[in-house]
């Protein structure tokens, strides 16, 4: 099996967590009784929390690297794999991720390595993270600048997640993560863009970035950019701020009402 370095892929998945925030919302902000609740926002963002940990572990296997943040047993102890020139099929048996969740199940990985672009597709089949079951595909298109000063990851998802209580969340769409490396952590910038749909509890949420969500790697949250979350005809804009390294964002409802939230 041809091996290539996907360590930067792990960094990209860490940026996903920057989108997670806690809402201090109040009912009635939209003027017609329709709002976007904290629970709904958590549902929209929850798919990346689950799939990201698994993807990071796969990146470690493919790259042949080690990372203290991810603990994966050696082949034969934790997983078995059959390799080809273009990928592998791996079956996991109680592998430990980040010291918490056991992963079990099968993933089929195929990839194509180019001089400037690497395409990697992971297909999950009854893949468990703890008691949460993942099915579907995630395709990663990974590129870097010729000067190696930045790296970009486009993630195309078509997947379903069955929670421990039996509820199902599905997601499809594309997200792009870009990391521009600086001389320091403060000077390294992370950008997120894309559009995707999430279906849960009978509702469909359409998410689209209007202005790329950006922030310094030294900040805990994204600090600029806007995205729109649409549900049942209600479109709420989330504004991440003016560049200050804080934990504040603003919800903007169609009638002009605004609401400040803590990230």
List each model region and its residues.
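Low-complexity, intrinsically disordered segments exposed to solvent
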Residues: 25-263
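Hydrophobic alpha-helical targeting segments used for export or membrane insertion
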Residues: 14-15
């Amino acid at each position: 099996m041809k091996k290539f370095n996907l360590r930067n892929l792990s960094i990209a998945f860490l940026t996903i967590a920057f989108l997670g925030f806690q809402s201090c919302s109040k009912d009635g902000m939209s003027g017609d009784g329709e709002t976007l609740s904290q629970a709904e926002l958590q549902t929209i963002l929850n798919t990346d929390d689950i799939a990201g940990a698994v993807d990071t572990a796969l990146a470690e296997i493919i790259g042949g690297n080690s990372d203290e943040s991810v603990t994966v047993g050696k082949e034969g102890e934790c997983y078995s794999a059959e390799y080809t020139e273009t990928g592998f099929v791996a079956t996991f048996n109680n592998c430990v991720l980040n010291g918490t969740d056991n992963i079990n199940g099968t993933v089929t990985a195929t990839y194509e390595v180019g001089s400037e672009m690497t395409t990697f597709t992971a297909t999950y089949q009854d893949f468990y993270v703890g008691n949460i079951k993942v099915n579907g595909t995630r395709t990663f298109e990974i590129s870097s600048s010729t000067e190696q000063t930045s790296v970009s990851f486009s993630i195309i998802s078509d997947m379903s997640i069955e929670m421990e209580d039996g509820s199902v969340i599905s997601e499809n769409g594309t997200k792009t993560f870009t990391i521009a490396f600086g001389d320091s952590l403060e000077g390294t910038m992370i950008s997120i863009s894309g559009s995707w749909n999430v279906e849960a509890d009978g509702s469909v949420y359409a998410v689209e970035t209007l202005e790329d969500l950006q922030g310094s790697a030294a900040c805990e949250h994204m600090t600029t950019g806007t995205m729109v979350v649409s549900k049942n005809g209600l479109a709420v804009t989330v504004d991440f701020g003016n560049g200050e390294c804080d934990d504040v964002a603003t919800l903007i409802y169609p009638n002009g009402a605004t609401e400040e939230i803590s990230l």
